[in-house]
Amino acid sequence: MSNVHVIDHPLVQHKLTLMRKKDASTNSFRRLLGELSTLMAYEVTRDMPLQDIQIETPLETMTGKVIDGKKLVLVSILRAGNGFLDGMLNVVPGARIGHIGLYRDPDTLQPVEYYFKMPSEMAERDIIVVDPMLATGNSAAAAVARLKQLQPRSIKFVCLLAAPEGVATLQKAHPDVPIYTAAIDRELNDHGYILPGLGDAGDRIFGTK
């Protein structure tokens, strides 16, 4: 699993544990997710390419470094992925935002796209796909396949929790796409929930059932 990165920073692990607690309120869960996504954004963007530019400080001219290439794109897998956006935008406020909506066909159990909205000129952009949970991995794999049609420079997948099954599915379909997660949990149950997990991330973010 050389392309799987578990972010084990103490603050990330501390906040994730607080989110897992069943008595965490919607407000607390949402706040912690924002803080976690900000912390994770630092790790995920660590290898972004840089270019040299000449600038004027108040005292002299110097060569500084800025991010190279087109603006980064954050792509949320609806709806729970939206909970990642504000925290990540704290780190990369100039990023563009895309959304992709998928549901599982009850007969085939395969993901079906119902919404796809991206910024213009996606070719040669770096994309970070966000979804709190990597469970079966089918939706993540479908989303990445759809995004590859736009010929981006790179794609990364970021989640809070991953199941081994989801990691295997996404890696098999897209071995070139790195996975960043705060934890890899034990397994999926019969209903497709990650164990021990944290429940339904979308419901806990938005206060729904």
Curated annotation (Swiss-Prot):
Pathway(s) of this molecule: Pyrimidine metabolism; UMP biosynthesis via salvage pathway; UMP from uracil: step 1/1
Binding positions for 5-phospho-alpha-D-ribose 1-diphosphate per the UniProt entry: R79, R104, D131, P132, M133, L134, A135, T136, G137, N138, S139, D200
Reactions catalysed according to its record: UMP + diphosphate = 5-phospho-alpha-D-ribose 1-diphosphate + uracil
BP GO annotations: UMP salvage; uracil salvage
GO MF annotation: an example: magnesium ion binding
CC cofactor: Mg(2+)
Family: Belongs to the UPRTase family.
HAMAP family in the record: Upp_B
Protein name: Uracil phosphoribosyltransferase
Top-level taxonomy: Bacteria, Pseudomonadati, Pseudomonadota, Betaproteobacteria, Burkholderiales
Gene that encodes the chain: upp
